[in-house]
């Protein structure tokens, strides 16, 4: 998409300098565990993945291209000469390095990315020295994924001039004046530079191994330990912490919502939009200043074992003195993603609707309870809403299907060795609900949603209503 811009930068006299110098951005080094993980992941993918492929120089070239595009998706950071040099040096050796668990190439490429990003943001800051003359015509490509990399620094400068103009005009359209625009963008670009200093080896490894995994199959992913933990929490709809949703605003962790009944809400001393400026462990652990930290690092400090204590230094939304609040961590259920029942009156009849956002662990048991609740409301029909449901646990979809059929197979799965396993209804000869049913789907209904809808259609248990589904005919398995 091309957007027309109006504007021209006047000449700069005194360029705004970054608050962080380039020598402060240090590339993290991979640990021995990172190398071991790389070797194990490579062995697992080459030996056991359903899609058979050969990890050779040709495939390594594809991994290289995907890695570059994941690092610089808009083609505005690297120069074409960078790509040519990196390709010549590393593209054909990635296969050998993956087999050996070596990460030299992956980290060297990322090192150059950090350097180029710093240079680009430094240049962007320099453009804020003088107010641009917003007259004349210019244009910017919003989507540059298929555009060529800039050949020269001058070409890159033009791309970033257009980007900065675009951001200036957007702020002008919000009735911002130049001094405020300059301050806003200077803060934005300096925060972007600061984030470069917070890069972790786990981040680099996850991006690199995902460039490998996604080249094999669009649904194969590598998760770092932190990402794997978050995935498990989302599948179980529970975590151990204080029950607050956090976001980063102007380098400060801000509370966006509170889970009813969780420790933060129970304290009645924390409110939405309060800021967390410090975190301490236990009754007497030192309070660490967390301003400027990565959000995921702050979250890790706040989460902890059920029953343990965490102390938060809170800056109230309305200002004033900060206060220290001690909370006892507890198990928190993520209710937003749980199945929910509503009963609507349609043409004088009570129709129950069970909305299932995802096939999480424990879903079937939750739906059992909702079906029992539904009976008490004398519903004459049931709608299972799977719109936007991207899937989840294979075990749960098999067990959930069993609530609505008496017996029989639900789905069959073929593995990498051509072995076929038929997954049967685990509760043969029984069904919890045998009344009228409809299943609602759309183009984002995928995986487990498709298995459920197809099974109920095949058994003539439900009318399927909606759009053609996503079409994901594979089953993922988690391996550590």
Feature map (PLM): residue ranges:
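Bacterial N-terminal signal peptides
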Residues: 1-12
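PDZ/PDZ-like domain segments forming the peptide/carboxylate-binding groove
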Residues: 53, 69-70, 92, 99, ...
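Extracytoplasmic/secreted proteins, especially bacterial periplasmic and envelope-associated proteins
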Residues: 36, 40, 58, 62, ...
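N-terminal-proximal low-complexity accessory segments that begin disordered
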Residues: 30-72
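Extended, small/polar residue-biased N-terminal targeting/export presequences
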Residues: 55-61, 67-140, 193-248, 309-311, ...
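Boundary at the C-terminal end of the N-terminal hydrophobic targeting segment
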Residues: 13-15, 183, 199
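Cleft-lining beta-strand/loop regions that shape enzyme active-site pockets
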Residues: 23, 29-30, 46-56, 194-201, ...
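Acidic/histidine-rich, surface-exposed loop or edge segments in extracytoplasmic proteins
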Residues: 17-26, 38-50, 89-93, 187-191
